[in-house]
């Protein structure tokens, strides 16, 4: 990979990992509501699911030309529906202000999110088909970059969870407002899948 292409790869992956997306918003919300330690299950589920999805993206990238466009479109709708459901759960979740506390999202729920999270699927397919496959079709490189993509995504999730933890007091004071803003950001993510 040339230095220019490598620079573009890092720019794309880091910006994509750090900008708001369903995983980051969920990590922020979980750490704000439950603290970083309680959010480790959510982060672990995301990380494992993310890795598996990136490895699946490696396989998809090899055969992208033969994928049925209707199947990709159906996956987009399923992902958008799940993201909107997640937005609803966050918007309506109890806050400290309400005197109630929702349970943290489970490992398996955050794991399952990855398989309908169109944003990370597009992230993986785009990175692999743009930066890796034109340079090499060696399976070891494709798998290695898939693992790297999952690590970069996990880094973004952890950064957002740490922000939620660090600003927990402020966020808890304005919990209802924060939940609504986070829910609206998730709805925005769902809409951006199509536009």
From Swiss-Prot:
GO molecular function: amino acid transmembrane transporter activity
The UniProt record lists the keyword Transmembrane: yes
Residue spans crossing the bilayer: 47-67, 70-90, 105-125, 142-162, 177-194
Broad class of the protein's primary localization: membrane
Membrane topology: Multi-pass membrane protein
Subcellular location: Cell inner membrane
GO cellular component: plasma membrane
Membrane as UniProt keyword: yes
Entry's Gene Ontology BP terms: cysteine export across plasma membrane
Catalytically driven reaction(s): O-acetyl-L-serine(in) = O-acetyl-L-serine(out); L-cysteine(in) = L-cysteine(out)
Keywords noted in UniProt: Amino-acid transport, Cell inner membrane, Cell membrane, Membrane, Transmembrane, Transmembrane helix, Transport
UniProt cross-references to InterPro entries, sorted A to Z: LeuE-type
Biological role stated in the UniProt entry: Exporter of O-acetylserine (OAS) and cysteine.
Family (UniProt): Belongs to the Rht family.
Protein name listed in UniProt: Cysteine/O-acetylserine efflux protein
């Amino acid at each position: 990979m040339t230095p220019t292409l490598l620079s573009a790869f890092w720019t794309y992956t880091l910006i994509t990992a750090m900008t708001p997306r369903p995983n980051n918003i969920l990590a922020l919300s979980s750490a704000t509501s439950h603290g970083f330690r309680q959010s480790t299950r959510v982060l672990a589920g995301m990380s494992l699911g993310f890795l598996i999805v990136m490895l699946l993206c490696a396989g998809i990238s090899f055969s992208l030309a033969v994928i049925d466009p209707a199947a990709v479109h159906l996956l987009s709708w399923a992902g958008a529906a799940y993201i909107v459901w997640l937005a609803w759960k966050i918007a309506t979740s109890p806050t400290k202000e309400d005197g109630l506390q929702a349970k943290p999202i489970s490992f398996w729920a955050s794991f399952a999110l990855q398989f309908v999270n169109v944003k990370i699927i597009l992230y993986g397919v785009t990175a692999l088909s743009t930066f890796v496959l034109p340079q090499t079709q060696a399976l070891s490189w494709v798998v290695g970059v898939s693992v790297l993509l999952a690590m970069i995504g996990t880094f973004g999730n952890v950064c957002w969870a740490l922000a939620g933890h660090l600003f927990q007091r402020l966020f808890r004071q304005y919990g209802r407002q924060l939940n609504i803003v986070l829910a609206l950001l998730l709805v925005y993510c769902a809409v951006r899948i199509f536009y």
